[in-house]
Amino acid sequence: MTRTLSWLLAALLVSPALAAPLPVTPTPQAKLLAPPAQPVPQPRQAQYPAGTLPLAGLGLKLVGNAPELGWAARDLRAEWQTRLGLKLTDGGSKSVTIGTLSDAALAAKVKAANLKAEGPEGYALLVDASGAYVVGATPRGAYLGVQTLRQLLTPQGLRFARISDAPALTERIGMLYLDQYSKGVNDRMIPLLAALKYNKVLIMSNYVQWDVAKSGGWAHPGGASKAEARRVADLARSYGLEPIPLIETLGHTGWMFYGDKNLDLRQDPDSQNPYAYDTLNPATYERVVFPVLKEAIEVFQPKVVHIGHDEVRNRDRFPARDNGRALGFEKLFVDDTVKLYSFLKAQNVGTMMWHDAAFSDSVVATLPAKLPKDIQVAYWSYGTSDGVEPLKKIRALGFPVLGASWKDPENPERLAKAAAAAGGGMIQTRWHGYFGNPSVWDGQAEQGVAYVRAANAFWNPQAPTLKNAPALYRDLYQPGSFLPVAGQTVSLKAVANRTLADKGGEGWIGKGPDTDLAALGQGVKRLGSYTFDLSGAVMTRGERAAVSELPERVTLPLGGRKAAALAFLHATGWPGNDRVPVGRYEIKYMDGSRVTQPLEYGRHIRAWTEPLGVPGASNFSMVAAPAWTGQTRDGMDVGLSVLEWTNPKPGVGIESVTLVSEGLGANPILLGLTLLGGQ
């Protein structure tokens, strides 16, 4: 009865006849993006003395003319403009000086500061009252040092720092894709990877619209053009990232059979969805594989090509043809690998491949001995194994080795330690289908977040695991200003129908004090980049018994207040199905017009029990910003997100916002509302 009365009272309070505008409180920092507390990747030797170098009179000084120094200046100027709306000009009464140890004065400065810059990617960084100095052992080191300096920028100036840094792993590779969405995504991913100090990119290139594919009728319309592939390679180089095209061969070769072409080259003649090619048919190489590799070399100008060669026998029969069965899998695999290796080597290009088919238990005693020892072998392991023994085993067999990690918590971190112990490098992979580039932000954002965690581990395997990787990823992919946005927090107390704490089974979702949201607290609080007035939950009806009697609609009267944007702190009570509409916000203006913001599960809103980063959780979106994570009393990880809605009519007053539920299992819950800008 108590629960029923509470929502009836809330309904009366917001009925058209009785509705009074909800109280608001002006705040000068309704939205405030804070600079990072510590650079990522974490430097291996760093001190941060108290103090800040003021921005007034600060200018840029480059010592040398290497391209990397120009890239460093570009990135630093972009940081000043994006974060503070300021121009970093040349000169100044004090300088941000960027150069290398080849300059005697800078070398002396590093020595006098008792810092060091060692190795091809090492740098020293000093910020004190006299200025800021980034000195690389090489121009490459200076460029990497500037990526650290960017993260010391605050609205007040550059934080004091004393850093001597160099990577533990010499190869730090991030994975990109070429599809029809390439430009919009890769133009963000490439600067992001550079800022995280990756030094190479593995570029999935199967479905590039190669000339030979277009003339043969097997070019996929979802693939990127050759011009786009070339542009991405050039862009990567301009950010210090060496491009490594990945052309999957032997297995995963559906690209060459698109449109039912080249079916005579199938390994398995009975396959309806060909997966591998016939290594004994010369036309496989003459018609398809060699022409594609030749074009890839022309486009990417690579030092190395990754030829795939993984999961060769996972689907179709292999060998499937009589002549192949007579020779056996091992000979077919070795002959194909050596053929591709020799083709690439003749053009001064190295070879990289995955480990699993060539180093499996069934063939490892014999097959690797037949392969050229300068093939780079990437050991992929996406689970809980630390990878130490497999990496050491591949290294002991004479091959340069890399680890390859994916998205699960601690996977990149564990494997990076193993790679460091084995003297290898690391690849951070991404697997979302060949034409799924946008999902790195919207749909499988957990794979994007993993780039941040991996970068930290690849540079400094001994660094602690990052706890704020989702927020860092969001900011790197979509950088924002450090300048505060004024606004107004809205008190929801008059319309709240559930308490956050559940002492007796009548609050939150009715499961008692061990499974409630008491950890969120009450009052005016900053959650992520936003400030909210927390006073209870506006919960809507859903299928579950605990919420089946709640209202389907709750209206929040705003009395004609204006805003440039609205920030909704929200969640659902229970999980739902991805991309299914579970509710909406209806915004009504004082002129009588209306706008609707849909709430698709997993995209705009998500269950409080599924925060980004929880093991096993997937299909995340960054459309809504991760804002808060905590734990229930029984130890369950929980979290909330913020959906920032841009107002298309900022000059018109908002009469009300109505939260509407579709009545499904995932019932929308509003916990905070803040008006950004406006009045």
Question: Model regions: which residues?
Answer:
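Positively charged n-region of N-terminal signal peptides that target proteins for export
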Residues: 1-4
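Acidic, contiguous N-terminal accessory segments
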Residues: 19-164, 353-363, 373, 477-482, ...
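Flexible loop/turn segments at secondary-structure boundaries
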Residues: 181-183, 193, 208-212, 250-254, ...
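N-terminal/edge-of-domain interface segments
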Residues: 474-679
